[in-house]
Amino acid sequence: DAIIGIVFSVIFTLVFLVCPQIVCIAFVKNGVSVYEPLFNLEYIRQTWYFILAFGILGVARESVRLIDGSYTKRVMLVTIITNLIDGALTIIWLLNDKIMNPNFFEGIEQLFGENTEVISQVFIQFNKVFLAIIIFALGINCIETVIKALKYSRK
């Protein structure tokens, strides 16, 4: 479980640092195949330190779980602290409107047609949707860890 978390943290970090353009949409524009990344690549490159911090926090959190071997109070504290820092950094990073590639939305319209108001709105707000999912997952992770740490510390 902890090893999978470490692997995921490393993969996330590498993908966003090395090839963030992999998350893209493909469409045909004027007879030419075009690939538009979801995120603004320049912003991603400028904020590489956020991505590195997310990776370090994830590896640190999972490493403590791996070293301790069970849900201890130390694991609980490390999880809460790293998730709070992770959440704060994620809010700062994802709420910047520069993160989204404006050309991506043109690709959505090209792909689905101009009458795709709902789809366009979802993608225009994607950074906020993505943020909500991440904050929700961090919250669930904290709650699960606290419950398990308290449960196993009584035994």
Positions of predicted regions on the chain:
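Hydrophobic alpha-helical bundles in membrane proteins
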Residues: 1-155
